[in-house]
C-alpha cells in the first residue's frame, strides 16, 4: 500500500481557482509577485499560488500523511490532534483526510495571513478549524493538546514573520506534557544535495526538544524527495497526480505578443516534478524520570 492521492481533490482545486482567475482582468498586477509573506495576503496572488503550487504540495503532504498513519498505528493511536503551523490554504488537511486510515483526527490550522480564497478549496468537515493567528501566539494550554505539528513549507515564513517567532514557538512545543510528539516537516527543496538553511531552521525546534528531555531516533537533518531521482514527474510516481492540461493558465496578451511576458509568474508552468519536494517525519519521545 502507498500514499493515497485523490484526483478529485486536484481537479477540484484547479477547476475552482481557474474559473475564479478567469473572472479577474488584472493578472499583470501580480505578474512579478513571488511566494513571500508580504504578498500572501493578496487574493489575486493567492489564486495564482494555488494553481501553481498547491496540487504538488498536496501530493507531498499525502506522502507525509501516509507515513504518519503507519507510524501512529504502530503505537495504537485511534485519534490524533493535529496543528498545522503556517497552513495557508490547508492542502495538508485533505492529505491527512485521505491517508489517516481508521484514525480520527482534529485539524487546527494557523496562519498569520488571511487566505480569503480558502472558499475555493474543496469542502471540509467538522474536524477542521482555521485560526488567523501567528503560530508563536498559540496558547501553551492549546499547544499541550497536540500530538502532531505540521510545518507545510512554512518554517522559514514563521521564522521571517517576526523576531524570535520560531524560538518562542519551539519553547512552547518543547514544554508540552505529551510523551510523544510527531513533526511533519515539508521544505522548499534544496535539491537534496546538502542540508539547506531552511532545513537547518528546524534545528531550533530540535534543540529545544532535546533540552527539555525529549529524545528521537530520527535524523532531523535527513530529508527525502519521493521515489526515484530528482526531476521525476509526479504522475510517474503516482498516476493519480492528474493536473489536467486544460486547467493550465493561458494569457491572451502573451499569445498575441502584445506585451513582454517572458518572466510573468502568473502563467508559469505548475509544479509537475519532484524538484520542489523535500520532507521528513520526526518522532520525539519523553520517558518518565
List each language-model region with its residue ranges:
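N-terminal auxiliary segments of SAM/dcSAM-dependent transferases
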Residues: 1-31
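Class I SAM-dependent methyltransferase Rossmann-like catalytic core
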Residues: 34-74
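Conserved class I S-adenosyl-L-methionine
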Residues: 77-88
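Conserved SAM-binding loop of SAM-dependent methyltransferases across substrates and taxa
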Residues: 89-102
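S-adenosyl-L-methionine
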Residues: 119-143
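A short SAM/SAH-binding and catalytic strip from SAM-dependent methyltransferases
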Residues: 146-163
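Conserved beta-strand signature within the Rossmann-like core of class I S-adenosyl-L-methionine
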Residues: 177-190
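Class I S-adenosyl-L-methionine
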Residues: 194-289
Amino acid at each position: 500500500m502507498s500514499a493515497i492521492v485523490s484526483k478529485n481533490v486536484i481537479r477540484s482545486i484547479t477547476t475552482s481557482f481557474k474559473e475564479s482567475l478567469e473572472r479577474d482582468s488584472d493578472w499583470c498586477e501580480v505578474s512579478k509577485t513571488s511566494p513571500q509573506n508580504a504578498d500572501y495576503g493578496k487574493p489575486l496572488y493567492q489564486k495564482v499560488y494555488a494553481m501553481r503550487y498547491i496540487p504538488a504540495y498536496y501530493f507531498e503532504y499525502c506522502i507525509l500523511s501516509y507515513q504518519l498513519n503507519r507510524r501512529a498505528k504502530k503505537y495504537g493511536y485511534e485519534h490524533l490532534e493535529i496543528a498545522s503551523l503556517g497552513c495557508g490554504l490547508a492542502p495538508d488537511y485533505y492529505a491527512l483526510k485521505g491517508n489517516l486510515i481508521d484514525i480520527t483526527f482534529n485539524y487546527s490550522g494557523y496562519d498569520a495571513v488571511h487566505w480569503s480564497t480558502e472558499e475555493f478549496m474543496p469542502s471540509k468537515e467538522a474536524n477542521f478549524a482555521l485560526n488567523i493567528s501567528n503560530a508563536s501566539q498559540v496558547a501553551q494550554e492549546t499547544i499541550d493538546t497536540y500530538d502532531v505539528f505540521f510545518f507545510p513549507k512554512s518554517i522559514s515564513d514563521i521564522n521571517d514573520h517576526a523576531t524570535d517567532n520560531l524560538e518562542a514557538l519551539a519553547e512552547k512545543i518543547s514544554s508540552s506534557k505529551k510523551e510523544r510528539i510527531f513533526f511533519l516537516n515539508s521544505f522548499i527543496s534544496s535539491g537534496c544535495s546538502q542540508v539547506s538553511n531552511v532545513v537547518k531552521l528546524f534545528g531550533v525546534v530540535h534543540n529545544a526538544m532535546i533540552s527539555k528531555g525529549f529524545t528521537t531516533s530520527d535524523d532531523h537533518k535527513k530529508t527525502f524527495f519521493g521515489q526515484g531521482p530528482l526531476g521525476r514527474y509526479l504522475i510517474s510516481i503516482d498516476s493519480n497526480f492528474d493536473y489536467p492540461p486544460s486547467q493550465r493558465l493561458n494569457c491572451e496578451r502573451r499569445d498575441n505578443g502584445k506585451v513582454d511576458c517572458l518572466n510573468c509568474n502568473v502563467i508559469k508552468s505548475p509544479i509537475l516534478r519532484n524538484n520542489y519536494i523535500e520532507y521528513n517525519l520526526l518522532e520525539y519521545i519523553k520517558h518518565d524520570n
